[in-house]
Curated annotation (Swiss-Prot):
<dbReference type="GO" id="GO:0003779">
    <property type="term" value="F:actin binding"/>
</dbReference>
<dbReference type="GO" id="GO:0036195">
    <property type="term" value="C:muscle cell projection membrane"/>
</dbReference>
<dbReference type="GO" id="GO:0005925">
    <property type="term" value="C:focal adhesion"/>
</dbReference>
<feature type="modified residue" description="N6-acetyllysine">
    <location>
        <position position="295"/>
    </location>
</feature>
<dbReference type="GO" id="GO:0005829">
    <property type="term" value="C:cytosol"/>
</dbReference>
<comment type="function">
    <text>Actin-binding component of the Arp2/3 complex, a multiprotein complex that mediates actin polymerization upon stimulation by nucleation-promoting factor (NPF). The Arp2/3 complex mediates the formation of branched actin networks in the cytoplasm, providing the force for cell motility. Seems to contact the mother actin filament. In addition to its role in the cytoplasmic cytoskeleton, the Arp2/3 complex also promotes actin polymerization in the nucleus, thereby regulating gene transcription and repair of damaged DNA.</text>
</comment>
<dbReference type="Pfam" id="PF04045">
    <property type="entry name" value="P34-Arc"/>
</dbReference>
<dbReference type="GO" id="GO:0030027">
    <property type="term" value="C:lamellipodium"/>
</dbReference>
<dbReference type="GO" id="GO:0070062">
    <property type="term" value="C:extracellular exosome"/>
</dbReference>
<dbReference type="GO" id="GO:0030838">
    <property type="term" value="P:positive regulation of actin filament polymerization"/>
</dbReference>
<feature type="modified residue" description="N6-acetyllysine">
    <location>
        <position position="275"/>
    </location>
</feature>
<comment type="subunit">
    <text>Component of the Arp2/3 complex composed of ACTR2/ARP2, ACTR3/ARP3, ARPC1B/p41-ARC, ARPC2/p34-ARC, ARPC3/p21-ARC, ARPC4/p20-ARC and ARPC5/p16-ARC. Interacts with SHANK3; the interaction probably mediates the association of SHANK3 with the Arp2/3 complex. Interacts with DNAI3; this interaction reduces binding of the Arp2/3 complex to the VCA domain of nucleation promoting factors.</text>
</comment>
<dbReference type="GO" id="GO:0034314">
    <property type="term" value="P:Arp2/3 complex-mediated actin nucleation"/>
</dbReference>
<dbReference type="GO" id="GO:0098794">
    <property type="term" value="C:postsynapse"/>
</dbReference>
<keyword id="KW-0963">Cytoplasm</keyword>
<keyword id="KW-0206">Cytoskeleton</keyword>
<dbReference type="GO" id="GO:1900026">
    <property type="term" value="P:positive regulation of substrate adhesion-dependent cell spreading"/>
</dbReference>
Length: 300
């Protein structure tokens, strides 16, 4: 299985190139790039007010207001410090870099810029991981509508943090492949006792969402992660956040890859069957042609 990259490579490569050219004393060039990411996220890299010595990186998330309620602004201020500026119009967060005043740790700064989406997501996880560490219980469940028709729920208890993703399957084939995929996760946990518990429910929401307006339907699935202190403690939580916030994309990416592989194998098998049928086809019977006098035509 393939792990999706947590960072955004376009941001990192663009910024790294700008920093490298500035450090070499090259003349700055204009940049104007708009591109999308998973979960309807939109990025914009530009020169504010046409100033080529400044590079602005902005991100738009439809659900950012929900993240703000869980401390997203404070976390971003802690991570990005003075690089965080007022967001440009149409975006939720903007970072500004001055090519005439390069930071000392350029590689670290570039990497953190590439982690912008992840760091926006991280606030809700850090908040509930902290609740669990402090033994708090009864806090309101976090509800993040991270896609138009899909939702993430996070809830903490004294001994665990429960994260539930709702997801919509496009067709019946996706449901079947998704179930097989989730079964592999259950089998994997048997081999690793430190892995979190993973549960999958189809059509009906899990018991954790019994009193909510969680969606119900034949194309609805719910993936539940039960995270214990070994997954949420200070030394492990960064890696846990990296992996879990991309899980929905990870699941659907592999469903699409599986379908593509199956279709490729089907086409290959069909081609093999056609070759067998062509070899088995009898040769056309040659008819003997004669003239009215009884002579036989012969091909030259």
């Amino acid at each position: 299985m393939i792990l999706l990259e947590v960072n955004n490579r376009i941001i990192e490569e663009t910024l790294a190139l700008k920093f490298e050219n500035a450090a070499a004393g090259n003349k700055p060039e204009a940049v104007e790039v708009t591109f999308a990411d998973f979960d309807g996220v939109l990025y914009h890299i530009s020169n504010p007010n046409g100033d080529k010595t400044k590079v602005m990186v902005s991100i738009s998330l439809k659900f950012y207001k929900e993240l703000q309620a869980h401390g997203a602004d404070e976390l971003l201020k802690r991570v990005y410090g003075s690089f965080l500026v007022n967001p440009e119009s149409g975006y939720n967060v903007s970072l500004l870099y001055d090519l005439e005043n390069l930071p000392a740790s350029k590689d670290s700064i570039v990497h953190q810029a590439g982690m912008l989406k992840r760091n926006c997501f991280a606030s809700v996880f850090e908040k509930y991981f902290q609740f669990q560490e402090e033994g708090k219980e009864g806090e309101n469940r976090a509800v993040i509508h991270y896609r138009d028709d899909e939702t993430m729920y996070v809830e903490s208890k004294k001994d665990r943090v429960t994260v539930v993703f709702s997801t919509v399957f496009k067709d019946d084939d996706d449901v079947v492949i998704g179930k097989v995929f989730m079964q592999e996760f259950k089998e994997g946990r048997r081999a690793s006792h430190t892995a979190p518990q993973v549960l999958f429910s189809h059509r009906e929401p899990p018991l954790e969402l019994k009193d909510t307006d969680a969606a119900v339907g034949d194309n609805i699935g719910y993936i539940t992660f039960v995270l214990f202190p070994r997954h949420t403690n200070a030394s492990a939580r960064d890696n846990t956040i990296n992996l879990i916030h991309t899980f929905r994309d990870y699941l659907h990416y592999h469903i699409k890859c599986s379908k593509a592989y199956i279709h490729t194998r089907m086409r290959a098998k069909t081609s093999d069957f056609l070759k067998v049928l062509n070899r088995a086809r009898p040769d056309a019977e040659k008819k003997e042609m004669k003239t009215i006098t009884g002579k036989t035509f012969s091909s030259r």
